[in-house]
């Protein structure tokens, strides 16, 4: 992972020997059309402190599902929002851990699907995180 000058982000120290993964907000697997695009996903600007179980579980599974939908039915616009609060965990390094993640999908026919994931260990199916888009 690389940093971007003049942008304050997390860094390797924030992920060292703890429960947090470098959760890609724009998944590397969705940018395999070129090495240049793939490399851009490995920036600290594109990652968030994400519970390891969530990142490797439901979050990853929904990323794969979105790629399947895009391949089968056409483009899917994806927007991610991180949720922070006054109760968000702050690591000793000074990095703030998001409380959760919103993922908003808009399909080419303007149909929408919205999801919310608490930033915690879970064993749900990704579909159980769907929320009302309104």
Regions found by a protein language model. Give the residues of each.
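Domain-level detector of nuclease and nuclease-like folds
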Residues: 2-134
């Amino acid at each position: 992972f690389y940093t971007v000058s003049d942008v304050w982000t997390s860094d390797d120290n924030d992920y060292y020997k703890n429960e947090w993964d470098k959760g890609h907000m724009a998944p590397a697997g969705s940018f395999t059309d070129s090495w240049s695009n793939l490399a851009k996903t490995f920036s600290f600007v594109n990652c968030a402190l994400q519970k390891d179980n969530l990142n490797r579980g439901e979050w990853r599974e929904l990323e794969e599902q979105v790629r399947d939908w895009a391949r089968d039915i056409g483009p899917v616009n994806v927007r991610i929002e991180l949720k922070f609060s006054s109760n968000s965990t702050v690591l000793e390094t000074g990095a703030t851990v998001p409380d959760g993640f919103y993922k908003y999908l808009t399909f080419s026919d303007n149909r929408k699907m919205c999801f919310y994931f608490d930033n915690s260990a879970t064993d749900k199916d990704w579909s159980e995180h769907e929320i009302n888009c309104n």
